[in-house]
């Protein structure tokens, strides 16, 4: 069943994956942005809304932490030094320990081509910066009540 987010391809948030009704066993979210202040600000927002959240600025640490901590969602910046969000999404999708996670691109790159690339590598949603926090919260809140999750 596809959730109705009231969004279209020109919106600041686009969701591609259908979400099946079920419940999430926890509300863990991993935020990854090489700009530490942005990651910390988003972490504070999510914690204030009742999520358990960790923020990373090192893209090279993402796959290991995601596999160990098992967040239900990973919010990734696209443009980062060393390893970009597109490659991180590919790696997270390729690993059975992380392939089930909700992947949200959070980026200033917002062209139709940018969104198509994000979708092609496995992102479930694309949020354009500057991010409308309420939109991201709507996606995560909907996912916590509408997405089946079982830790491997």
Where are these regions (language model features)?
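Active-site beta3 strand of CheY-like receiver
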Residues: 69-75
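Non-catalytic signal-transmission and effector/linker regions of two-component phosphorelay proteins
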Residues: 1-30, 43, 134-152
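Hydrophobic/aromatic residues positioned on beta-strands within the core alpha/beta folds
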Residues: 104-106
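Short hydrophobic/Thr-rich beta-strand motif most characteristic of the beta2 strand and flanking loop
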Residues: 50-58, 62-65
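Two-component/phosphorelay signaling modules centered on CheY-like receiver
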Residues: 36-54
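A Lys-centered signature of the CheY-like receiver
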Residues: 129
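Receiver (REC) domain active-site loop signature in two-component systems and cognate sites
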Residues: 80
């Amino acid at each position: 069943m596809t959730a109705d987010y009231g969004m279209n391809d020109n919106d600041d948030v686009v969701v591609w994956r259908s979400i099946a009704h079920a419940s999430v066993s926890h509300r863990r979210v991993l935020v990854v942005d090489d700009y530490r202040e942005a990651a910390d600000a988003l972490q504070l927002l999510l914690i204030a809304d009742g999520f358990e959240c960790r923020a990373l600025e090192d893209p090279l640490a993402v796959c290991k932490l995601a596999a160990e901590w098992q967040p239900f969602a990973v919010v990734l910046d696209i443009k980062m030094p060393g390893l970009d969000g597109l490659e991180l999404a590919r790696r997270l999708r390729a690993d059975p320990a992380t392939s089930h996670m909700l992947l949200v691109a959070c980026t200033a790159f917002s062209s139709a081509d940018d969104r198509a690339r994000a979708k092609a590598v496995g992102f479930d949603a694309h949020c354009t910066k500057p991010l409308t926090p309420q939109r991201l919260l709507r996606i995560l809140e909907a996912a916590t009540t509408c997405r089946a999750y079982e830790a491997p």
